[in-house]
Amino acid sequence: MTKIVVIAGPTASGKSDLAISVAQRFNGEIVSADAMQIYRGLDIGTAKVTKAERELVPHHLIDIVDMTDKFSVAEFVTRADQVINDIAKRGKLPVIAGGTGFYVKALLGQQPLDFVASDEAEVALLKQKSLPTLVTMLKAADTILASRVDLNNKQRVIRAIQIARHGKRQEDISRPTYDALIVGIDWPREILYERINRRAQKMLDDGLLSEVEHIMSVGGESIQAGKAIGYKEFFPYIRGEVTREQALLAVQQDSRRYAKRQLTYLRHQIPGLIWLHGTDAATKLTSEVKAWLD
C-alpha cells in the first residue's frame, strides 16, 4: 500500500511551507489538492508557490488547465492517483498539500465520486425530452446501467445517460488505497484571521488586480475560476461599483468565513486527521512522519 502524507488546513495556515519542509526532509514531491491552483494564470490570488519554491521541490497538479475550463473532483482524483503512483515508483514520498477538503476526502476514498463532469448544454437539451424518450435513450446506451436506475426519476435518468455516453460507473473503476498520515494545521482564531488579512493585502500589493481583469476578459463570474474568493470580490471594483478598500475588506471577510468552513469540514469529514499547532507544526510533523515511516 502506497504511503502518502496529507497536509490539510484552512487558507493562509501555512500548508505550502510545511509541505515543502516535509518533502525536503523525506525525499518527497508535492501534489497540490487545491481546486483553484489548477488554473494557469491564477497565481497571486490563489497563493501559488513561487517558481523558486517549485525548484526546491517538484510540485504537481498546479497550472494544468486554462482558467476557462471546468474541472471536477473526479478529474482531480484520476490525475492525482496517476501522479502519486509515479512518485512512489521512483522511491519518493508523495506529500499532498490540500486546501480543498472535498478533494482530500475524495482522494482518500472517503466519498463517492462522480466520474463525469456535467455538461450544462447537454443537460439542457436532455431536459427538453420526455421521460419515456429519455428511458429509451438510456436503454439503448447501456442496458445494465438502465436496470440500476430509478426510471421514474427524470434527473437520475439524465445523469445516467451522461455516464453512459461519457464516463464510467464508479464500480467499474479500480482505485488504489493509500496508507495516509493525515495532519491539519490549526492556529488560534485571531492569529489565523490576522494571517488571512495580511495575505489579502499582500496579494493586492503584488498585482492581484491584473489577474482580476484577465478573468473578467475571459468570462468573469460565468467561469469556474471567476467564482474564487480573492477575485470575485474585485469584479464590482473594476466595474466602478465599490471602492478598492471595500473590495479588499470583502476579500478578507469572505476568506475568514471560508477558513471557518474549512476547519469545520476537516474536523467533521476527514477521519483520522491529527491536528498540529501552527507555531511548531514543522517540528511535530517531522517527528510524526519519521515514526510513521519507521
Swiss-Prot record:
GO process annotations (BP): tRNA modification
Enzyme type, top EC level: transferase
InterPro entries linked: Dimethylallyltransferase, IPT, P-loop_NTPase
Classification via Pfam families: IPPT
Positions bearing the site annotation: Interaction with substrate tRNA: 100
This enzyme's EC code(s): 2.5.1.75
Residues annotated as binding substrate: 11-16
Cofactors demanded by this protein: Mg(2+)
Keywords from the named record: ATP-binding, Magnesium, Nucleotide-binding, Transferase, tRNA processing
GO molecular function annotations of the record: ATP binding; tRNA dimethylallyltransferase activity
Domain of life: Bacteria
Reaction catalysed by this enzyme: adenosine(37) in tRNA + dimethylallyl diphosphate = N(6)-dimethylallyladenosine(37) in tRNA + diphosphate
Signal sequence segment: none
Annotated spans, Interaction with substrate tRNA: 155-159
Keyword Cell membrane: no
Residues the record lists as binding ATP: 9-16
UniProt keyword annotation of Cell membrane present: no
Job description of the protein: Catalyzes the transfer of a dimethylallyl group onto the adenine at position 37 in tRNAs that read codons beginning with uridine, leading to the formation of N6-(dimethylallyl)adenosine (i(6)A).
Quaternary structure (record): Monomer.
UniProt similarity note: Belongs to the IPP transferase family.
Name under which the protein is recorded: tRNA dimethylallyltransferase
